[in-house]
């Protein structure tokens, strides 16, 4: 399989495992962006926990699913977003205003759109989950 995006492969395998009713999924290869994205998902309760396994190659991540994840995906290319444009993207990508999160990479790190709005920083959109 051709890996166009490691983050895209990660999120699609998690979404497929969730639809099949699996309790855990193994993701390889690993990257820092995937770990930060999973940390944001865990903070909001969409995944139970995850563990990084170092296999002296590219690494693996074992993610424990809790059945709350409906859909997740990557936005490619990574569009630039100002603080004022975040509201428009949430309307495009998420089913409701109170439901789901857009993950941004900013100068202050990888965070969800609500935290970016509070810190008044823009950035590039990585993906979404709800």
Curated annotation (Swiss-Prot):
The lineage of its organism: Eukaryota, Viridiplantae, Streptophyta, Embryophyta, Tracheophyta. One of its GO terms (biological process) is translation. It comes from the Eukaryota. GO terms for molecular function: structural constituent of ribosome. This is Small ribosomal subunit protein uS8y. SUPFAM superfamilies: Ribosomal protein S8. PANTHER family: 40S RIBOSOMAL PROTEIN S15A. InterPro entries: Ribosomal_uS8 (IPR000630), Ribosomal_uS8_CS (IPR047863), Ribosomal_uS8_sf (IPR035987). Keywords: Ribonucleoprotein, Ribosomal protein. It comes from Arabidopsis thaliana (Mouse-ear cress).
